[in-house]
Amino acid sequence: MAAAATMAAAARELVLRAGTSDMEEEEGPLAGGPGLQEPLQLGELDITSDEFILDEVDVHIQANLEDELVKEALKTGVDLRHYSKQVELELQQIEQKSIRDYIQESENIASLHNQITACDAVLERMEQMLGAFQSDLSSISSEIRTLQEQSGAMNIRLRNRQAVRGKLGELVDGLVVPSALVTAILEAPVTEPRFLEQLQELDAKAAAVREQEARGTAACADVRGVLDRLRVKAVTKIREFILQKIYSFRKPMTNYQIPQTALLKYRFFYQFLLGNERATAKEIRDEYVETLSKIYLSYYRSYLGRLMKVQYEEVAEKDDLMGVEDTAKKGFFSKPSLRSRNTIFTLGTRGSVISPTELEAPILVPHTAQRGEQRYPFEALFRSQHYALLDNSCREYLFICEFFVVSGPAAHDLFHAVMGRTLSMTLKHLDSYLADCYDAIAVFLCIHIVLRFRNIAAKRDVPALDRYWEQVLALLWPRFELILEMNVQSVRSTDPQRLGGLDTRPHYITRRYAEFSSALVSINQTIPNERTMQLLGQLQVEVENFVLRVAAEFSSRKEQLVFLINNYDMMLGVLMERAADDSKEVESFQQLLNARTQEFIEELLSPPFGGLVAFVKEAEALIERGQAERLRGEEARVTQLIRGFGSSWKSSVESLSQDVMRSFTNFRNGTSIIQGALTQLIQLYHRFHRVLSQPQLRALPARAELINIHHLMVELKKHKPNF
């Protein structure tokens, strides 16, 4: 098969070569015709050349054998020579047809050739034009860059010139003195707005000239003389104006707040002096300090003197202590006269002085109070005095800071230069008064007034009085503690045997303590202080010991208990009116009262029902120990107890109720004690019933005589007092 394929390929190659030779002969006449191209030079096509690579030929043959036409020809057994002739003929026909088509389209082809040539010429000219345009663009771009560089340089020069112009303009404006400024400074009154405006302009120009002189600017010499003369004139006019305002403070009955308000409108005047004439500024400040210092001192000295004239005529003395014997005979409901005792131990309405409404109320006017014959306790005078001091000090401090342009330590120093003498005088007056003051409530109220005024000053952002408040408290606290300790000592050293006749009603010393303690506790609750509570605790211990010492003077335990209950109840009632229910004082006296009340009820039930109480306790003890059989020997005793209770319980309860109501001054407390005694009696009789229900006593004939427990309760309710 391979040999046949090789032979077929060789035959086909020979046919092609022969056809090519024939075509060359036929095309010979046309080849020499005009306008035709030379025949193709195909080179050497001899397949027998040694240079032909057989392997490659074999590959081509194999590839041709894969052709469908070749496969079909080999399959049908077509004669290859005939087939090649047929193919050659077809190729010649196609070639002739192509030549004829080419000849027919030769004009069009020539026209197309001319058009292409013309287009080439046009494109060449366009290329030349675009080249020239590109060259022009390159030149323009270079020019634009040059212009940009020139523009940037011009902008820099412009900015520099503008900066120089601005600096020069500022310099010239700062140095030039306009005529309006000269006219206003020389001719206008200081109170006119234009004088203030031009004064600010003059201050700015003077500052600018000083700055330029420091830089060595020669032009400053031209205006220095004019500015100096204007400055001297302005300083003179300002000095006269401010000193005149300060001197107006000295006029009698002058409200110095009005000149201060006027000065604040022209506070720039002092700033101008401070920056341009410090000697004059110091002169004005010193004159202000000297004038206001004397005015405040004179005012407060006079006010204090007149204020103390409306104090209560009778005040507490060193003998007006809690434990000092009250020589005056007093009834049960009586209390020390307000005029004679000045409410030493009672608070009353005095506590209102620290209420928000009273604390910042208008100050007292002494001559008005004198005309109305009104009198006040010391704490009211103290509040009025220090509220005036607080209000004026706050206003003065703020004025100093704003007008004299000071703050911090400098403001404190200037404030104390103005108010120092007044504050010292006030402290000396307070120290002198406290030396003979024995009214602890007044001193304690003054302490709380100071604490509240200190908070008000802090809210107003006026720290200048902080040191003064500390000094006042340093005077008040030791005196308060001393008075409290004196009262403690007076109670401790009181001898009950020297107090006269004994009485089971509340003692006047315990009443004093109750009023005094409730007053201090109620005040202290607003701003708690541990030291105060410690001192009150000491006083409470001494009062409790005093009550026990007095109770020991009674011969019977019943009277002792009545005295203790009356005093504890009174102290508890007074404390609960002002102190909180959970305060230590209230809880302490409540426990003491409950304990003594329970003991008194047992003491009260003992005479009429003592036998019943003793039997019930003994029987319950036997039952608890399992010795109930021993109750069989108590039948006679039980019978006697049943019959005795049935015959006497009503009269005993009636007597008991009357005894209680006679013994206790507080009807509510007496009612509570009666109720407690009857309740305990019912419980006792109920326990007696349970004992009699034991098997050992169940068959006792006297059990039929027992009073029904419900009937007893109904009857006892009739003896409950109603108020």
UniProtKB/Swiss-Prot annotation:
One Pfam family matching this protein: Vps52_C
Coiled coil spans: 107-127, 194-215
GO terms, molecular function: syntaxin binding
Main location: Golgi
Localisation per UniProt entry: Golgi apparatus, trans-Golgi network membrane; Endosome membrane; Recycling endosome
Entry keywords, A to Z: Acetylation, Coiled coil, Endosome, Golgi apparatus, Membrane, Phosphoprotein, Protein transport, Transport
GO CC annotations on file: cytosol; EARP complex; endosome membrane; GARP complex; Golgi apparatus; membrane; perinuclear region of cytoplasm; postsynapse
Entry similarity comment: Belongs to the VPS52 family.
Function: Acts as a component of the GARP complex that is involved in retrograde transport from early and late endosomes to the trans-Golgi network (TGN). The GARP complex is required for the maintenance of the cycling of mannose 6-phosphate receptors between the TGN and endosomes, this cycling is necessary for proper lysosomal sorting of acid hydrolases such as CTSD. Acts as a component of the EARP complex that is involved in endocytic recycling. The EARP complex associates with Rab4-positive endosomes and promotes recycling of internalized transferrin receptor (TFRC) to the plasma membrane.
One GO-annotated biological process of the protein: endocytic recycling
Membrane-related topology note: Peripheral membrane protein
PANTHER family per the UniProt record, alphabetical: SUPPRESSOR OF ACTIN MUTATIONS 2/VACUOLAR PROTEIN SORTING 52 (PTHR14190), VACUOLAR PROTEIN SORTING-ASSOCIATED PROTEIN 52 HOMOLOG (PTHR14190:SF7)
Chain positions with N-acetylalanine modification: 2
Protein name as catalogued: Vacuolar protein sorting-associated protein 52 homolog
Residues bearing PTM Phosphoserine: 355
UniProt keyword annotation of Secreted present: no
Oligomeric form and interacting partners: Component of the Golgi-associated retrograde protein (GARP) complex, also called VFT (VPS fifty-three) complex, composed of VPS51, VPS52, VPS53 and VPS54. Component of the endosome-associated retrograde protein (EARP) complex, composed of VPS51, VPS52, VPS53 and VPS50/Syndetin. EIPR1 interacts with both EARP and GARP complexes and mediates the recruitment of the GARP complex to the trans-Golgi network. Interacts with RAB6A and STX10. Interacts with BLTP3B.
KW Endoplasmic reticulum (keyword) present: no
